[in-house]
Amino acid sequence: MNRMGFFLMLTAAVLLTSLVCTEATPADESKVKRARWSRIEGSRLFRHRLPKSSQSTCPYCQISCCPPAYCQPSGCRGP
């Protein structure tokens, strides 16, 4: 009976662990998506925070053109 109780407890522990791990998966996926979006947003913000010496302000649209772009009446142009 002692061995039977041990295997019963072991089986219950395995089933409980698998249930807990499956329930945690959707939360982990949302964390991964959120981290991915924050990296994308962070890289967008980083592109706009270049040093002032490497930017020229476009008077037509009041934005900064980063080299090798140049300012035209319609906005920043260049590669």
Curated annotation (Swiss-Prot):
Keywords: Disulfide bond, Hydroxylation, Secreted, Signal, Toxin
Entry's free-text remark on domains: The cysteine framework is VI/VII (C-C-CC-C-C). Displays a mini-granulin fold, a structure composed of two short, stacked beta-hairpins connected by two parallel disulfide bonds. This newly described fold is derived from the same cysteine connectivity as knottins (ICK fold). The name 'mini-granulin fold' comes from the structural homology with the N-terminal region of the human granulin.
Residues with PTM 4-hydroxyproline: P59, P67, P68, P73
Covalent S-S links between cysteines: C58-C66, C61-C71, C65-C76
Gene Ontology molecular function: toxin activity
Family that this chain belongs to: Belongs to the conotoxin U superfamily.
Membrane-spanning residues: none
Signal peptide (UniProt feature, chain positions): 1-24
Recorded superkingdom: Eukaryota
Keyword presence, Protein biosynthesis: no
Protein name: Conotoxin ba-2281
Main location: secreted
GO CC terms in record: extracellular region
